[in-house]
Amino acid sequence: MNGSADAGPRPRKYVFITGGVVSSLGKGILTSSLGALLRARGYRVTAIKIDPYVNVDAGTMRPYEHGEVFVTADGAETDLDIGHYERFLDMDLSRGNNLTTGQVYLSVIQKERRGEYLSQTVQVIPHITDEIKERIRKVAEEQKAEIVVVEVGGTVGDIESLPFLEAIRQFRFDEGEGNTLYLHLTLVPYLETSEEFKTKPTQHSVATLRGVGIQPDILVLRSARPVPEEVRRKVALFTNVRPGHVFSSPTVEHLYEVPLLLEEQGLGRAVERALGLEAVIPNLSFWQEAVRVLKHPERTVKIAIAGKYVKMPDAYLSLLEALRHAGIKNRARVEVKWVDAESLEAADLDEAFRDVSGILVPGGFGVRGIEGKVRAAQYARERKIPYLGICLGLQIAVIEFARNVAGLKGANSTEFDPHTPHPVIDLMPEQLEVEGLGGTMRLGDWPMRIKPGTLLHRLYGKEEVLERHRHRYEVNPLYVDGLERAGLVVSATTPGMRGRGAGLVEAIELKDHPFFLGLQSHPEFKSRPMRPSPPFVGFVEAALAYQERA
């Protein structure tokens, strides 16, 4: 940590973030923002998300219920908050950074079956709580973190969270008061009718937290508008928290404002003080510039996302963030027009895409809306509108090209039509004998070998890159030569994949198009505010150019 080099190693610090009153207050953004403030002070930080559900991971959950599944470099299917952590901290996390009830109980039961608890009665305390603490410490050690920020999902008072709250309570007993900090995020509603903030829900939430043995050191009050100083002092008095340790987190236009807003109020210094750390002035210049561009862009461009889950934008959270990062890089604001892919099957496409300068077809599963996505890809190809296809979006582009350019009537994916005469998209050979759904796809970082002279090579500026993946189907290698003869450019492959000759198709593009790119990977998962994804930067740049021509 910061300080004298001869002071010797210092104890690791732990910050535990809980939430009260209602769920979905933004604990993930608060955790990410605090992590960013500590990183800006030069500390090595990691963040862990605790999810109290019994699922082992988020891989099989419905996007409409849980939002996107974020994939880590090591192939874990995790909660979307892990994506927030990676973007704000600008670092790769791992499967250990998302801890679930399912993982904990599965591990404890397996240990019991192996005889590791021989002669013991296995109980929530100490066996479950010890497993939780062991997993948190293991991540901290593996990632060489000086400060570990742990978000406890759910709401204080939920029965599912009790073992985790007990485990983090024990951390103070194990590590000492100066090495642990409890931060509680809670709702302070503002009543328009009486024009006042109501603090009673927060008081009850803190009382519930104290009932399980945790006295919060810091409170962050979530509200639609800034909570005034006198209200914060009242909350401090009734919750036994220092007045200078109660902060306001109002709704903001851009989430990248949150670290700046909290730092301006002194949250970073309060955490330093509570953990016995030296005062360090953070370097927040990037965040300040990013917010300036978002609030005062030089240009604005509209992109259509033709997807299946358009009524739940969180299902495409990393896509939206990657577009935002690309917009910042191009000093532009990216507006998104949500287009229900199913509606495109019979829609007037001129009307559906009338005011957009780019079309993006995201990843997804299932047959619903597929033909609408095919029509969107055809429209982009024929009208020379910039097109970016992600995962399924690449497969859609190949299906459309095969049908309408290569002359393969009825071409399709075996996922949607098992009896198609031309299975240009087919199940990967490695997936033929896979049983079960959870964690069984081609997941995580895989290498892409890029062909020189292609659009993709211009975007990345190198011949091999790593990108995240999450798929079971691929471009059928038996059709690649014929598609290339018809004019499709295979601009990247993964070398050495079994039974594929030149390798699994990772990217396709068109020569006679200003920007038509399909990627089997999910580059949005590696896009960061400081290091935006090259395909997204190029896509937004092309959309801006198209807008100027139009």
UniProtKB/Swiss-Prot annotation:
GO terms for molecular function: ATP binding; CTP synthase activity; glutaminase activity; identical protein binding; metal ion binding. PROSITE patterns: GATASE_TYPE_1. Signal peptide: none annotated. L-glutamine binds at residues 64, 364, 392-395, 415, 472. Keywords: ATP-binding, Glutamine amidotransferase, Ligase, Magnesium, Metal-binding, Nucleotide-binding, Pyrimidine biosynthesis. Its EC number is 6.3.4.2. Belongs to the CTP synthase family. Allosterically activated by GTP, when glutamine is the substrate. GTP has no effect on the reaction when ammonia is the substrate. The allosteric effector GTP functions by stabilizing the protein conformation that binds the tetrahedral intermediate(s) formed during glutamine hydrolysis. Inhibited by the product CTP, via allosteric rather than competitive inhibition. Homotetramer in the presence of UTP and ATP. Is in a protein concentration-dependent equilibrium between monomer, dimer, and tetramer in the absence of UTP and ATP. Transmembrane segments: none annotated. CTPSs have evolved a hybrid strategy for distinguishing between UTP and CTP. The overlapping regions of the product feedback inhibitory and substrate sites recognize a common feature in both compounds, the triphosphate moiety. To differentiate isosteric substrate and product pyrimidine rings, an additional pocket far from the expected kinase/ligase catalytic site, specifically recognizes the cytosine and ribose portions of the product inhibitor. InterPro entries: Class_I_gatase-like, CTP_synthase, CTP_synthase_N, GATASE, GATase1_CTP_Synthase, P-loop_NTPase. GO terms for biological process: 'de novo' CTP biosynthetic process; pyrimidine nucleobase biosynthetic process. Pathway: Pyrimidine metabolism; CTP biosynthesis via de novo pathway; CTP from UDP: step 2/2. CTP binds at residues 23, 158-160, 198-203, 234. Residues 302-549 form the Glutamine amidotransferase type-1 domain. This is CTP synthase. Residues 1-277 are annotated as: Amidoligase domain. Mg(2+) binds at residues 81, 151. Catalyzes the ATP-dependent amination of UTP to CTP with either L-glutamine or ammonia as the source of nitrogen. Regulates intracellular CTP levels through interactions with the four ribonucleotide triphosphates. The active site is at residues 391, 522, 524. NCBIfam families: PRK05380.1 (NF003792), PyrG (TIGR00337). The keyword Amino-acid biosynthesis does not apply. GO terms for cellular component: cytosol. It holds the Pfam family CTP_synth_N. It catalyses: UTP + L-glutamine + ATP + H2O = CTP + L-glutamate + ADP + phosphate + 2 H(+); L-glutamine + H2O = L-glutamate + NH4(+); UTP + NH4(+) + ATP = CTP + ADP + phosphate + 2 H(+).
